[in-house]
């Protein structure tokens, strides 16, 4: 057995010891973290959020509740975790996690027809007319390209009526990137009930990202990739919200109202996997470019992404935060100063003015 002990030279009061023991005992009965929070009536110190999350994560990794102890002796307090040398493999994941992974494994391969169109676009001698003729053979794809050309991210003075015109306005390079999101839409739309709500939110994120990109003068190619990444960044949430609707909705309500933990951390504790990880696994399965897998994996942890992806992840994070603030699910004070500086917002008034105008324009 491996024992990990973290010691602090602070004495716990009898009330604190009693509260901790109550939370440990309660945590053993919860099926997931969302359930724990719905039942938590004591608001002091987050009603033991950190403690419950720790116990749920240990449970997800196959450790029993008895593996975790808090001891107070004299003026010292210790947190002890006992890790057995052998943990049975079948206990390493919750059944919920296994079911989610099975659903990812069961997804079809990325449409070959779309890959063929991307290959055709990459050839220098291909014309818009030739590409349009190939796309027209796929009625669903043609309709989705027209919808995209008329969406907020590509809004024009007049409605785009023809596929040829849509491709011309979008541009071949940008279309090649957007085909990743359109292929994803074809696969997920009919299979997962949460698709439409998340897709609408992702369209709003893409629209905001385009405005942010213009504000900070990103190159045209970068903007094209950014819009596509914004459309794709939450596909993991589509899966989790469809498969674990009650838990995900509870987590969303709790993280917004209690302001004591990120939704991603709560997903990890409750389900054993996060929507960011689910997204990156799908991107890996479909062999997407790194840009898209990074956008899926790091849009909630933008400050730790590699520097080469900052121009994509920072705007996506900020666009997401704008949407959350619009819905009163987050506050301006939560946004890291580094990201505000990158996106050229010097103060809260400037940010809120931009956010309000973006909302009115969407």
Q: Predicted regions: what is each one?
A:
Residues 1-49:
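Glycine-rich/acidic phosphate-handling loop/turn and adjacent ATP-lid/helix
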Residues 251-252, 277-278, 306, 344-345:
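Charge-biased C-terminal accessory regions appended to nucleic-acid-, cytoskeletal NTPase
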Residues 89-234, 238-247, 263-275, 281-293, ...:
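Conserved alpha-helical "signature site"
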Residues 46-67, 71:
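Conserved glycine-/histidine-rich ATP-lid loop and adjacent helix of the Bergerat-fold HATPase_c
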């Amino acid at each position: 057995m491996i024992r990990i002990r973290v010691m602090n030279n602070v004495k716990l009061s009898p009330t604190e010891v009693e509260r901790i023991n109550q939370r440990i005992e309660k945590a053993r009965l919860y099926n997931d973290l969302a359930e724990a929070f719905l039942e938590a009536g004591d608001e002091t110190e987050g009603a033991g959020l950190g403690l419950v999350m720790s116990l749920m994560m240990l449970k997800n990794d196959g450790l029993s509740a008895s593996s975790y102890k808090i001891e107070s002796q004299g003026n010292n307090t210790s947190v002890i975790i006992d890790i057995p040398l052998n943990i049975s493999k079948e206990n390493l994941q919750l059944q919920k996690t296994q079911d989610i992974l099975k659903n990812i494994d069961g997804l079809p391969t990325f449409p070959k027809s779309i890959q063929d169109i991307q290959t055709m676009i990459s050839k220098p001698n291909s014309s818009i007319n030739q590409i349009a003729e190939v796309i027209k053979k796929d009625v669903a794809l043609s309709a989705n390209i027209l919808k995209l050309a008329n969406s907020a991210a590509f809004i024009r003075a007049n409605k785009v009526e023809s596929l040829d015109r849509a491709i011309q306005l979008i541009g071949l390079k940008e279309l090649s990137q957007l085909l990743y999101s359109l292929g994803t839409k074809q696969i997920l739309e009919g299979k997962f009930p949460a698709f439409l709500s998340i897709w609408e939110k992702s369209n709003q994120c893409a629209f905001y990202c385009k405005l942010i990109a213009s504000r900070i003068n990103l190159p045209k190619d970068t903007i094209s990739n950014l819009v596509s990444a914004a459309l794709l960044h939450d596909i993991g949430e589509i899966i989790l919200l469809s498969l674990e609707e009650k838990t995900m909705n509870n987590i969303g309500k709790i993280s917004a109202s209690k302001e004591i933990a990120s939704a991603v951390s709560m997903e990890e504790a409750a389900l054993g996997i996060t929507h960011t990880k689910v997204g990156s696994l799908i991107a890996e399965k479909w062999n997407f470019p790194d840009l898209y897998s990074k956008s899926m994996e790091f849009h909630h942890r933008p400050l730790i992404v590699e520097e080469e992806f900052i121009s994509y992840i920072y705007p996506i994070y900020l666009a997401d935060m704008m949407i959350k603030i619009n819905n009163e699910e987050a506050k301006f004070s939560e946004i890291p100063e580094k990201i505000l500086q990158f996106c050229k917002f010097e103060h809260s008034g400037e940010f809120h003015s931009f956010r309000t105008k973006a909302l009115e324009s969407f």
